[in-house]
Swiss-Prot record:
Domain of life (superkingdom): Bacteria
Keyword Methyltransferase listed: no
Residues annotated as transmembrane: none
Stretches of the chain forming a coiled coil according to its record: none
Modified positions (Phosphoserine) in chain numbering: 58
Keyword tags: Phosphoprotein, Sporulation
Organism for this UniProt entry: Lysinibacillus sphaericus (Bacillus sphaericus)
Stated name of the protein: Anti-sigma F factor antagonist
Length: 117
């Protein structure tokens, strides 16, 4: 499991996940993301799932937990480009409304309120 965390604006972080996300990798990712949220600047997380090949229930818990943390700052979450299998998992978990098929740039523009077309 490999991941990248990039602050694209003062309020928005993009998390790129690669490989397999299981309970072994979740703790490291959770600590970094929660630290950014609790510093008080992050209000939006864009999870780029394009490079993710597998995620178990601990990965869903990771996303749900960060969504709860963001609720305290009226934050938002975007689940970007999940695979067909992960799309089903997110839909069954009630996370369907947060999914988006787009580029990172389009997701960032949506967060900023810029809508093209």
């Amino acid at each position: 499991m490999h991941f990248q965390l990039e602050m694209v604006t003062r309020e928005t972080v993009v998390i790129r996940l690669f490989g397999e996300l299981d309970h072994h990798a979740v703790e490291q990712i959770r600590a970094k993301i929660s630290a950014a949220i609790f510093q008080g600047t992050v209000t939006t997380i864009i999870w780029n799932l394009e490079g993710l090949s597998f995620m178990d229930s601990s990965g869903v818990g990771l996303v749900l937990g960060r969504m709860r943390e963001l609720e305290a700052v009226a934050g938002r979450t975007i689940l970007l480009n999940p695979s067909p299998t992960m799309r089903k998992v997110f839909q069954f978990s009630g996370l369907g409304p947060w999914m988006m098929d787009a580029t990172e740039e389009q997701a960032i523009d949506r967060v900023r309120g810029i809508v093209n077309g």
